[in-house]
Each structure stands twice: as structure tokens, then as C-alpha cells.
Amino acid sequence: MEDSIDLQRESLNKLIPESGSDDTSSSDEVNGLPTSSDGADDVSLINSEDLNSSLLKSDPGGTNKSDQTKNDETDSNDDQRIVLSGGVELEEVQETVKVYNNVKQALLEVETTDESQLILDKIKRDSQYSSDTECESRDADSELEDIQLEFRSKYPQLQIPYSDELCVKIIPYLDIVYDILSGVVTSMYYTRAKRAAMDSKKAFLSAEDFRNLDINLFTAGYFGLRRQLKVGNIIYEKFRDELARSKSPKIQWWGPIDFANYVLAPEVLVSFVLDTCQNKRSVQLTSRQDVYELFDNTTYYGNTVTDNEPLESWELSRKKRKYGPTNNQKTHKTRKKKS
């Protein structure tokens, strides 16, 4: 009898856990009943936590608390798209976040702007600019016509040939170059060139010296600079050797090409004008000094009108197709109507 009771006790001891838990929970587990609500919450928390956090909690080394704090900081900073590294201060992080948010907000504002409105605004601005430019161009053309009419009424006998025609007409007057180089003829342009060379501290004409020159003092008046340079090129090709061998400090300072363009070319044109206008009663050009004064008084006309007219004869037809009659043709028609 006693042996039977001992066997029953041993069987019950096997069913009861040795951890010392209370009888209620043990009996529930034995009978297959659900556990308490506290136990269910614990199971839910474990299943919802990150795997790394679970491993840290089960770490027997006791470092789970500090590592969990670092993980929480990293997760928080990941939400702000900032990765902390060792040695970075909190104020720097906050400032970086502030700048990032400002840039992001600005980009969002740009993206939300109506692009079609921007395009319309640009078209409107471009149209206004084009209209203003066209008005300015018309005003400039009108001003040029007024200047040309005044010049033609004052100097009706002065003709401005195209460059190819002019380069043929000046050939008989190239001999004046020998007279200027030898000192037989006094040249106003040579005197000005000499003064420019003496005022310079350089042995040769430098870019700075050239920028400081008043180029109007070396321009053949109403002929304009473009035609003058064409004449200068012919002079240089014909007198290249003489200019290169010259011992004159002034010619050496200017150099053969610039001396031909800005000293000799105006003098050749002076001879051309003096010869073609001497026999015309309407103009009193009896000396080179008279032509010098004419050139000085008509430099503005050459720069603003002549240099904007076709240089070659073939340019005239192209300009006529694009813009209509040139200023020369308009002036001729105006004079014809008045007569």
C-alpha cells in the first residue's frame, strides 16, 4: 500500500516543474489551458523586435543596454538621412539637417512651379527685347540717313568708291610714298606718328600703346577705316622692302604694316582727293592742308556711315535683297525729287 502511494507521488513530481513556479500556472499548462495575458504580451514583444536587439538582450556579457542605445540613435538618424560618425558634435548634425531641409524645400518649390508659365514669361521677355532692339535699329538707321544727307548736301562732289574700285584709282598716287619716306613732302600723319612713338616708353608699338592711341588721328576721314586698310595693304605689298630696310626709328617703332595702314594710306588718299577735287568749283581744296582738315572734320561720318555701308560691290546686291535700297540709293532718290 505504501509503495503504491510513493509511486503516485513520484509521477506527480515529474509533471510539476522544478523552477518553483506557482501552482496555478503549472496546473493550467498541465491541463492544456491558455496561459495568462502577461505571457502573451511577452511573446508579442519578442516577435516584433529587431533581430539584432533580441540578440543583444540575450547577450550574457551585459552589454545590451549601451548597444541598444547606439542602435536607437542610428535608427533615429536614419530617418533624417544622416549617418553619425565618431567625433561629430550634435550642433554640427543639427546644422546639417537644417541646411538639408532648406535645400529640399527649395527643390520642392521649383518642382511645383508651373513650367509652362515660365516658358510664356521667357517668350514675353524675348519678344519685348526683340521689339526694343528693332526700334533702336530703326532709330539708328534714321540717324545715319540724317548724317548722310547732311554730308551729301555739304560735299556733293565727294564720292566714296567701293574698295575694289578705290584700290584701282589710287595706283597713280602711290609715288607720294617715296616723297614722304625721303622727307620731300611734309606729312601731317607722319608728324602724329612721330609724336606717338616719342611718347611711348617701348621700343616697338605694343598692344597697350595701340589701345591708348586716338585712332581717329590716323584715319582718312569720310573714307572710313575699312577702305583705308585696303589701301594700306596695297602700299605694304608694293613698298615692303623699303619699309623693312628703313633706319627711321619711327618706322621701326610702328612696324612696316601699321606704318603703311595708319600713316601712308591716309597720305595716298589725300593725294587722290586733292587731284580729283581741285577742278571742282564747289569745293575749295587747293592744298594738302585743306584735305587734312576735311578728313579731320569727316572722321565721324567715315566711322558711322561709310564703315557700315557695303565694302565690295557684290555686297550691295545682298544687302538690297535683305534690307532694301541702301542709304546711297535713298539719298540719290531724295536729291532727284528735290530737283
UniProtKB/Swiss-Prot annotation:
Q: Which Pfam families match?
A: RTC4 (PF14474)
Superkingdom of the source? Answer: Eukaryota
Q: Which UniProt keywords apply?
A: Cytoplasm, Nucleus
Q: Which stretches are tagged as biased composition: Basic and acidic residues?
A: 1-12, 67-80
> Where do the record's region annotations for Disordered lie?
1-80, 312-339
Q: Which PANTHER family match?
A: RESTRICTION OF TELOMERE CAPPING PROTEIN 4
Family membership, please give it.
Belongs to the RTC4 family.
Q: What is this protein called?
A: Restriction of telomere capping protein 4
